[in-house]
Every structure is written in C-alpha cells, then in structure tokens.
C-alpha cells in the first residue's frame, strides 16, 4: 500500500503516545504513516515520582521540542492533536509546520475566555495545590472521571486512569490562566496559519467544552472548519464510537 502521507499525533495533558494506539492502528491500515512523539518528561512510569523539572516546563518548551521533531521530517505533516495537543498543533501550524491540522477537543489559546464552572471543577484538584504552577500535578481518579474519562465504559476508566502521568503545572496555568501570563505562552498568530484546520468539539466535554472550541474557531477567524461530535465527552480518542467518529472525521477533513 502506498503511503498517503505522514500524520504527527500530539497527545494531551497527563498522557503519552499510548493515547493514539487505536487511532494509529486505524489510520495506518488506511495508508497513513503515523508518528507519535511523547512530550517532554511524559515518557515515565505513572507509579514513579515525576521529574521535578516537569513542573516548570512551558508550553513553549513542548512546542520547541515538536518543532525540532517536525523539521527532521521530509516535509510538513498533517498534525493531529488532542486537548493540549490540539493547542500545540495550532501553535505549530502558525509556524508553518503543518500541511493540515485536525484539533480534537483542543485547549484554547490566549485571548479566548473559556472558563466555565465545569472547566473550573475539572481543574479544581490542581488549582487547590499550593503554587501549582511550579510543580508537577496529577488529577485524582474522581476528578479525572469527571473531567476526561466519563464517556468511557466504567470498566475502562480505572485502567485508563492508571496510565496517566503527571503534567506541568506551568503549562496548565499558561492555558487556563493565560491572562496572568506575561509571556502569553499559549498565544497563536491566527493570521500566520496557512493550512486547512479542522476543529472538533464534543457535546458533553467538561474539560474543553464545545462552547470553548466554538470560541476558539471564532478567534482563529473564517476559513477554519468546525464540527461537533454528539453524545461524547473529552476522551474522543477512545470512547465508544471512536472508530465511526474518526472515519467520518477523515472524510470531512
């Protein structure tokens, strides 16, 4: 089978390349070359203490690592990002590093007011930790189910949670509290994006609500495609119906 192109799959908060296991198998079976880089300090055993340097790792550090990775390829790939990975894909697209970008339930860039009661509750376990923006943080099980994993069958929630690692408190602050970040690390120059972009929201998402994805699409401006998956939460990478959603998503893209 001839290779149709290269997809760089960018995982989200607390995750790793395993997030894309199902998507990669599906897309590779249809001729795509799928690459799954792991964000800095995320290639870790969830049972081990996190690297303390993770706590102050910036979105800009993640983006710089991914930029170096992509520049080592033969040409600009399609970027497929989930959650924070969707925001990183947007940042990279604005740097001219994407042939196209698909953003699944993406985190929002600076300038988008996305805080809702559900978002605040989703991050509450992080926000209550003293100086959370300087330490590695991880959601508790109940918080993760509320924010991310609620659309999974009950029997899959704990095994999925047990694979989650710590995340950078700084990166979380740069997204959720962008208005307090003097560097605006989550800033995206929408005018610099020269490739097709598809944004996908989920109707029942609490972590990156459909309302926030719509605001992000409006912020980016005309020319970007927006779709919404019904009856689905944040974990679009593995919840029931993921195969049908991805197949439909690829046809629309």
Model-derived features with residue positions:
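Conserved alpha/beta-hydrolase
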Residues: 27-50
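Active-site glycine-rich loops that stabilize anionic/oxyanionic intermediates
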Residues: 12-15, 83, 203
């Amino acid at each position: 089978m001839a290779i149709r192109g290269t997809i760089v799959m960018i995982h989200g908060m607390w995750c790793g390349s395993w997030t894309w296991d199902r998507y990669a198998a599906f897309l590779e079976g249809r001729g795509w070359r799928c690459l799954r880089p792991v964000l800095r300090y995320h290639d870790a055993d969830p049972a081990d203490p996190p690297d303390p340097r993770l706590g102050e790792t910036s979105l800009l550090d993640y983006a710089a690592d991914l930029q170096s990775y992509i520049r080592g390829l033969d040409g600009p790939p399609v970027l497929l990002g989930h959650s924070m990975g969707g925001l990183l894909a947007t940042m990279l697209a604005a740097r001219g590093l994407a042939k196209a970008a698909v953003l699944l339930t993406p985190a929002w860039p600076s300038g988008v007011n996305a805080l809702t009661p559900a978002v605040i509750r989703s991050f509450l376990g992080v926000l209550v930790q003293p100086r959370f923006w300087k330490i590695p943080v991880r959601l508790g099980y109940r918080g993760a189910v509320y924010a991310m994993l609620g659309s999974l069958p009950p029997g899959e929630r704990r095994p999925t949670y047990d694979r989650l690692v710590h995340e950078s408190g700084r990166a979380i602050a740069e997204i959720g509290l962008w208005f307090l970040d003097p560097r605006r690390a989550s800033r995206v120059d929408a005018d610099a994006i020269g490739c097709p972009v598809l944004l996908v929201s989920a109707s029942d998402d609490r972590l990156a609500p459909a309302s926030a994805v719509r605001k992000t699409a409006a912020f980016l401006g005309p020319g970007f495609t927006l779709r919404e998956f019904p009856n689905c939460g944040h974990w679009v990478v593995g919840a029931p119906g993921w195969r049908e959603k991805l197949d439909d998503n690829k046809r629309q893209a």
